Amino acid sequence: MASYEIVKGDLFTAQTSLAHCVSQDLRMGKGIATEFVKRWGRPKELYDQRYERLAVLKRQNEQGEWRYLYYMITKEKAWHKPSLKDFMKSLVHVLKHMIKNDVKHLSVPKLGAGLDGLSWDLIERALKKQFVEKHGINVTVYVL
């Protein structure tokens, strides 16, 4: 049975697939996105995918196992605020990619609830219902 848990700690200690929100311009100059840039840079393969709702990198974790890094494209420019509708469209793309690639665990910050200002309650409900309950995907939310 899949699980949903909230953990106090550093998202980047997770060895699972990770997701975070970005703008289509891929500026990634604030918030948790800056840490993604420090760790994985801005490879060309991200820019090649930026006109979709989702950009994905496949990278090895510290144990040498493959995992996905999901860059959820929720808005056009870094200074814009996403709508809940656009956020949810991107989240569905993450879910579809995970199902297609048999990914069973996703670790995230409080997606969309930080700088983007979306309702965490609505996002949390979607994660629990669609990922955990409906598709058996484990979700771990990291908070500081």
Q: Which functions belong to the PLM regions below?
A:
Residues 1-144:
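Macrodomain-like recognition of ADP-ribose-binding/processing modules
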